Amino acid sequence: MVTIRLARAGAKKRPFYHIVVTEAKKPRDGAFIERLGYFNPVASGQEAPLKLDVERSKAWIAKGAQPTERAAQLIRQAERAEQAAQ
């Protein structure tokens, strides 16, 4: 099964997550099919806390990819931000 989930990166005590499409059986930080964007929970100043390709995420969900709870929240958040920008 294909999932959309967060892959952890960054340093100790400074998490940074890539939003990726991957097989459910692969390790959390292992190989992935496509990187859709990133989430930086400790962003400060001019740093963007979330960048996500909403169109690609919708396309993967239409193909049957299952987002995790947190990934689904971030997708909704990115959609709202995109609509507000228009």
Swiss-Prot record:
Q: Which family does it belong to?
A: Belongs to the bacterial ribosomal protein bS16 family.
A GO cellular component annotated for this chain's UniProt record is: cytoplasm
Query: What keyword terms does UniProt attach to this protein?
Result: Ribonucleoprotein, Ribosomal protein
The organism sits in which domain of life? Bacteria
Q: What is this protein called?
A: Small ribosomal subunit protein bS16
Q: Choose any GO biological process term that the UniProt entry carries and state it.
A: translation
InterPro entries in UniProt: Ribosomal_bS16, Ribosomal_bS16_CS, Ribosomal_bS16_dom_sf
Which GO MF terms does the UniProt record name?
Answer: structural constituent of ribosome
